[in-house]
Amino acid sequence: MKIYTRGGDKGKTNIHGGQRVDKDDIRIEANGTLDELNSVLGLIRVLIGEGHEWQEMLFYLQRSLMVVMSHVATPAALRGQNPNRLPEEPDVYCERQIDFFNAKIQYPSTHFILPGGNLVSAQCHVART
């Protein structure tokens, strides 16, 4: 499959199955937002370095976002044909990760957390927005 059409886009793009939709279609907007998050998570993975305790979690989240994006880009009539599945129930996985991080944080927090501190922290704040 080529990544270009040589025909100009005329404000349209393809989704799974070859259907043409407007570039301002909610599915394209949603996937653009998910792709931005995925890119920031990738940047965080590079910044923290190999072997960091967050690597596995961030990689899981990136893979999961790609699966979600594939479903967003699949028309309802073709959803059953999409072979992409999440590796684990995302709510269970995320709750386990939240519990892990909550155990490391001293509660109750009485202050707002200002974005920044260091580059990784700042990128984590960008990801959450």
List PLM regions with ranges.
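Phosphate/pyrophosphate-binding loop motifs in nucleotide- or prenyl diphosphate-using proteins
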Residues: 1-129
